[in-house]
């Protein structure tokens, strides 16, 4: 089978296109990393293009010891979500994590290109989430419009932000009962924001970067995108009300919901 016809490739390409159409992946915005299963790794190793291509090795400036030997599908630095479907061999790559480097074994235009600049944040988040859930597969970064807008209108405090979200819709506490993580504003890219995001990911599946976007993680594309959609939809409700929430679920009702579905003690 053509490597691009594998279901996880098709899902990744479809997700990128969807994010652009939703307005969450403008210009170079957005990136994703998908952890391949053992079965998927074996399929990739048996691909003829992979067999005949010598890996390109690039240095790794951070530690991800618990991911050594793991394979990831990654978007490239500078990729446009809008056009990934037109040239996936350039905009996507498969990498293998080593102790202090990564091997590009497929894609990125035969290893010429490089993984997203937020690759360190991605791998550190995978490492954090796998400790909480061994089935975690995906980390996505995007710029959901109303969620970003809400960070201008709401206090930058993750507990207060979470409680506001939970009050807006019964689905919120059911979809993210652990709450939402939030960082203060930080410089994006390869710096301190990566370890700080990963630290939040030890508890939360979504971490909001104020005035920028969010990182989200999950066990599948459906799981992760559904999580993002839920946050974004209710941020939109908040902004449509001008941040002036007079009614909504009470704290007791939120607790009742969570307990009814076995999410809280």
Language-model regions: role of each:
Residues 1-265:
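Glycine-rich flexible loops
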């Amino acid at each position: 089978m053509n490597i691009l016809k594998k279901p996880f490739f098709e899902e990744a390409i479809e997700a990128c296109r969807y994010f652009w159409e939703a307005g969450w992946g403008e210009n170079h915005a957005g990136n994703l990393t998908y952890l391949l299963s053992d079965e998927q790794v074996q399929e990739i190793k048996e691909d003829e293009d992979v067999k005949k291509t010598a890996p390109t090795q690039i240095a790794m400036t951070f530690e991800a010891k618990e991911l050594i030997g793991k394979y990831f599908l990654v978007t490239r630095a500078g990729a446009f979500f809008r056009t990934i479907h037109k040239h996936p061999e350039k905009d996507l790559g498969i990498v293998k994590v080593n102790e202090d480097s990564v091997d590009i074994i497929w894609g990125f235009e035969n290893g010429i290109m490089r993984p997203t600049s937020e690759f360190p944040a991605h791998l550190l988040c995978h490492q954090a989430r796998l400790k909480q859930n061994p089935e975690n597969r995906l980390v996505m970064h995007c710029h959901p419009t109303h969620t970003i807008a809400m960070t201008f209108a709401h206090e930058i405090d993750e507990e207060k932000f979470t409680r506001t979200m939970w009050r807006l819709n019964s689905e919120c506490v059911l979809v993210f009962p652990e709450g939402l993580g939030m960082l203060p504003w930080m410089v994006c890219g390869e710096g301190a924001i990566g370890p700080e995001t990963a630290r939040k990911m030890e508890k939360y599946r979504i971490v909001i970067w104020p005035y920028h976007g969010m990182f989200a993680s999950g066990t599948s594309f459906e799981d992760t995108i559904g999580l993002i959609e839920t946050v974004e939809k209710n941020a939109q409700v908040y902004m449509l009300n001008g941040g002036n929430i007079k009614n909504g679920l009470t704290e007791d009702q939120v607790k009742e919901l969570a307990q009814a579905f076995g999410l809280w003690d």
